[in-house]
Amino acid sequence: MDFITINSSNKTEEFALKQVAKQATSSLLYRLGKTIILASVCVEREPVSEDFLPLVVQFLEKSYAAGKIPGGFVKREGRAQDFEILTSRLIDRTLRPLFPKDYRYPTQITLMVLSHDIENDLQVSALNAASAALFLAHIAPIKSVSACRIARMDNEFIINPSASLLNQSSLDLFVSGTKESLNMIEMRSLGQKLNALEEPLMLEALELAQKSLEETCTLYEEIFTPHQNELFFKESQGIVFNERLLDLLKNQYFDEIIKGIESSALSERENVFNEIARKISEAHSEFSLEEIELSLEKVKKTEIRRMIIKDKIRPDKRALEEVRPILIESDLLPMAHSSILFTRGQTQSLVVGVLGTDNDAQTHESLEHKAPIKERFMFHYNFPPFCVGEASSIGAASRRELGHGNLAKRALETSIKNKEQVIRLVSEILESNGSSSMASVCAGSLALYASGVEIYDLVAGVAMGMVSEGQDHAILSDISGLEDAEGDMDFKIAGNLEGITAMQMDTKMSGIKLEILYQALLQAKEARKHILKIMHEAKEKIVINFSHLPTTEIFNVAPDKIVEIIGQGGRVIKEIVEKFEVKIDLNKPSGEVKIMGNKERVLKTKEFILNYLHSLDQELEQYAIDEVLEAQVKRIVDFGAFLSLPKGGEGLLRKQNMDKCQVVLKEGDSIRCRVISFNKGKIALDLA
């Protein structure tokens, strides 16, 4: 068993090697303060035949890690929570580009949170633990990576802030990479205001992150290298292509290949290339279908990259900085509170907005918070198979759908002025040819406005790409699905004219240099300006139907009157809600009553509640202290009996008053009683 301590970037990390889970390919216990994570890597010895990297990353939270028992009926951890899925994706997106292109061995990386102090950053800790475990496993020649988080307070950047400091920050920037370059970025603005970050400041933050990663990765490699396993997989020389087949494709089928490249729809493009492969297979039996498809893919990819880098033209004939045509339509769905159809090229997002009450907020339990938290702004992204012409069933939300919805939410969240408002936006992707998450951001921002939600500014999103060959590279604005698939970078950036509110960067390379990222940021700003101009023009044409939108009426009553509004077993409040078709939130300590729904119904509900309480007060005013009454037993409870009074209303005869007279009552009995007090709107009775 080996213990390793590493001090870097404002934190002290401890690694216990060969202590637990020793049957895994590699395992370690990672410790940062009171946070402990078990990281393990397991590799199967037989490769898969399919052409993909069979990597699975699972980040798992255990309730006992924070001294909790799972909430709900089943007291056991169930399906993964959103935070676990998003963190798993974050780690996967960091590590996947590091593997050799022809690595085909099923690999599972598991991160299990065993203990957690809420002040420590779980995502940074989990990624660093995964990186160390993978580096020690030595399953392939993989570089060491690490992560850091950057916050901003009082115009100063902070590396790896505590949770309490991050809550006060205007920036949340998560960066991972090697000591040479960055390979994954997640960013969002924080705070009560929009807090969009300007591009030069973003570069400054990324430079700070790169220095932190360089320091940590250098230490990791120096300290962990002596503890590595024997190298399992040595990168091969790659696929050896048949030159005769490549010449055949270039000379006889080149025009058809270009036709396929220029096809805008994925299904249409696949049909063209499948037809080419079929023709060659029938005419040249000496080539296998697999060999033909691999060679066809190589020629296609080479030509796409040549077009972009050398000719400065894209497969759909756009210039490198050109954004596809945009069409925006509003108010398509009469019963929703807002609906926006945003079409950019062959990508189409229908975002629907609905406003709700506090009861509609999503409640989450997690290790990052001591108590359950309410998510008041929800953004759900759906990617049905028909949007790319596929025939398959629609199931539960995928990891990708959760990730895209989370990105759109982070882009728009700070643009909302009233953070207490409960809002749900749903993006239905009806057509997709790249950048669907950024189309969701654009449509979502307009949907907020169309719902009558007060926003600081419109927010637009654009996906940037890059193609590189040697020392040459080209940055692409508003990438299509083909450019995403064949390119080297997917850099999604959202913001307004002032700066950036959210971004996400992934790469297929081992990393991206800062100067390329900054060029992409500046080019994205120009694309955003163009998109925002069209969005502002569309905004001017939106007519907000305030009569259809739900309104909220808030008023106060005496706190002791809240129980009267609720009624026995919730009977009164249920009747009010059903009668007026509204939503009601009640606050017992303050006496606040919040009614939400159609404006006319809300006002009628308020009037009804006030009249109802007034009638109860009038009933009390009919009685006097020491007045003797003939009452009837209405119901028996543990602490006494409720009696129906002759002039209306009811009073409580407590059990101790019945016991001292040795009286046994049953429902329906008549009894003489005396009014002894009025307490919080209730009449207290004694036997006369």
From Swiss-Prot:
Major location (coarse): cytoplasm
Disulfide bonds: none
Residues at which Mg(2+) binds: D484, D490
S1 motif domain mapped to chain residues: 626-688
Protein name as catalogued: Polyribonucleotide nucleotidyltransferase
EC number: 2.7.7.8
Localization per Swiss-Prot or TrEMBL: Cytoplasm
Family matches, as NCBIfam families: polynuc_phos, PRK11824.1
Gene Ontology terms: biological process: mRNA catabolic process; RNA catabolic process; RNA processing
Organism taxonomic ancestry: Bacteria, Pseudomonadati, Campylobacterota, Epsilonproteobacteria, Campylobacterales
UniProt cross-references to SUPFAM superfamilies, sorted A to Z: Eukaryotic type KH-domain (KH-domain type I) (SSF54791), Nucleic acid-binding proteins (SSF50249), Polynucleotide phosphorylase/guanosine pentaphosphate synthase (PNPase/GPSI), domain 3 (SSF46915), Ribonuclease PH domain 2-like (SSF55666), Ribosomal protein S5 domain 2-like (SSF54211)
Required cofactor(s): Mg(2+)
Recorded GO CC terms: cytosol
Reactions listed under catalytic activity: RNA(n+1) + phosphate = RNA(n) + a ribonucleoside 5'-diphosphate
Keyword Metal-binding applies: yes
Source species: Helicobacter pylori (strain ATCC 700392 / 26695) (Campylobacter pylori)
Keyword Nucleotidyltransferase: yes
